[in-house]
Amino acid sequence: MSQVIFSVDRGGAEPGAEMDDEMTLNMGPHHPSTHGVLRFVISTDGEIIRKAVPDVGYLHRSIEKIGERCTYSGFMPYTDRVDYIAAMFANEAWASACEKLMGIEVPKRAQYLRVISCELNRIGSHMIALGAMAMDVGAVTPFPWALREREYINDFIEELCGARLTFNYHRIGGVSFDMPKGWADKVKHWLDRFEPIMVEFDRLISLNDIFIKRLANVAVVTAEEAKDWGLVGPNLRGSGVKWDLRKEDAYSVYPELEFDVPVGRGRYGTVGDCWDRFYVRVEECRESAKILRQALDKIDEHPEDDILGKLPKKMRPDGEAYARIESARGDMGCYVIGRGAEEAYRARFRTGSFTAMAMIEAKSPGLFLADLVALIASFDVVAPEIDR
């Protein structure tokens, strides 16, 4: 959760001088150790926002240019920094683009391990988003609840690959490690307790009258607006658009798994409001739990340690490829061009947070200042996805 810090710019007016009704507020930036480095320059008329202009770039580290200076395999650890809240997805996007470029086939067991690791990461990312959003509008208890479940997930992923935040788990052609003995049973046992906890989470916050009043009918994004502005993931589905790359592109082993695609329905307000965007993520956690159960059962149909495909002796591809996956924040695409060298000629990421930030700016005018934090939290932007 970002700590909200305001500084007031009164345009250099002397104390007691007559002023117009507009006030400029600087919201942020925040320290890099918090959940994102964001700054908004906000103009207000009393408590009503006239405009909120995002100032991006505080976490820019030229990661795409770094991708053009590393070998194809050597760039994998850097992809963890594209979205450090859910790092598995950028791992998979880069690996998938390189595999497409080089014609590498990934073993089925490795594909299942990718799905399992990514769906765990999706739940962990949504737990942060849901807990932080509740905290931002004044509900304290849900945040430690959400962090507790994320800690269980971090423990599982640490057992799987040795890291808790930046994983470097996926490899071009597969994954780095098979799951340890007994690991699948631990995850299933956790799922047995996680699903009832999500029911309690609904009772505690999702269906809480005060919480609903803070979010329902706030910052409504229609389906047409969402598509026109290029929103993806839960932000697009929150506007009632049923679009999920796990279904539409049917990549990896997702066609073998059964799950639903939750969308906003305007249950307590209008389709596409802040509550819909919140609750789509709640329902996605339940769907990810379904996917995990199926994947953990089906993975045993494939031989152990068959986790890395046949790689070319030299990774010096010539051509270009684009691969996209459904990350926790939506469509994450990776475009790579090879020119026969050990390094990519061009590496490019397409992420969901950049367009979400543009929509935050568009939807801010007319809101109360107190609702801006809810709007930002409902889009679940993460700074390094914007600053690439």
Curated annotation (Swiss-Prot):
GO terms for molecular function: NAD binding; NADH:ubiquinone reductase (non-electrogenic) activity; quinone binding. NCBIfam families: PRK06075.1. NDH-1 is composed of 14 different subunits. Subunits NuoB, C, D, E, F, and G constitute the peripheral sector of the complex. It is an enzyme of class 7 (translocase). Its EC number is 7.1.1.-. One of its GO terms (cellular component) is plasma membrane. It is a peripheral membrane protein. This is NADH-quinone oxidoreductase subunit D 2. Keywords: Cell inner membrane, Cell membrane, Membrane, NAD, Quinone, Translocase, Transport, Ubiquinone. SUPFAM superfamilies: HydB/Nqo4-like. InterPro entries: NADH_Q_OxRdtase_suD, NDH1_su_D/H, NiFe-Hase_large. Its main location: membrane. It is found in: Cell inner membrane. Belongs to the complex I 49 kDa subunit family. NDH-1 shuttles electrons from NADH, via FMN and iron-sulfur (Fe-S) centers, to quinones in the respiratory chain. The immediate electron acceptor for the enzyme in this species is believed to be ubiquinone. Couples the redox reaction to proton translocation (for every two electrons transferred, four hydrogen ions are translocated across the cytoplasmic membrane), and thus conserves the redox energy in a proton gradient. It comes from Sorangium cellulosum (strain So ce56). It comes from the Bacteria. It catalyses: a quinone + NADH + 5 H(+)(in) = a quinol + NAD(+) + 4 H(+)(out).
